[in-house]
Amino acid sequence: MKFAILAVLLCAAMLAASPAPVDNVFTPDKIPYGPVPAFVPAGAQLAVLEGDPTASSGDFTIRIKMPDGYRIAPHWHPKRENVTVVSGTFKVGMGDTFDETKMGSFAAGSFAYMDPDMHHYAMASGETIVQVHGMSPLAFNYVNANDDPSKKK
């Protein structure tokens, strides 16, 4: 009996000492940014850190790197959106009309969430990186259909 307990403890100690897998860890210099999808304005970069935002269900985590002055027109999502500002200043306003004078400014470390169907718009002040976490599929609905970049020729 003592041998069996010792063997279990030894196995547990070996597992605890094993190095953590590195394929689910992203250091800032190794984040795989690429172009944003067509439903957001060109010019920003996007990295999928976890999950698949286009899947029919499941969690996803993405990062969006935006240049200074980058704007996202008023839009809404059918599912909750959780946003953390990683760097820069992210400006967010609520409503159906983009109005920079009514936007709040959020520095790195800030967190906000938008409930389903909440109409909002955003802008980067300086190069800005935000991390977005939510439930798939990520749907992006513009208040004004003419603002949807994927519909422009």
Where are these regions (language model features)?
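Positively charged n-region of N-terminal signal peptides that target proteins for export
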Residues: 1-4
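Hydrophobic h-region of N-terminal signal peptides that target proteins for export
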Residues: 9-17
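A short, N-terminal "cap"/entry segment at the start of jelly-roll beta-barrel domains
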Residues: 18-58, 147-153
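Double-stranded beta-helix
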Residues: 24, 101, 123-153
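Conserved short histidine dyad/triad with adjacent acidic residue
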Residues: 60-77, 105, 116
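Glycine- and acidic-residue-biased ligand/ion/polar-headgroup-sensing regions
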Residues: 67-70, 77-97
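Short beta-strand His + acidic residue motifs that chelate non-heme Fe in jelly-roll/DSBH
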Residues: 72-74, 92-93, 114, 119-125
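Short acidic-glycine-tyrosine-enriched beta hairpin
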Residues: 96-116
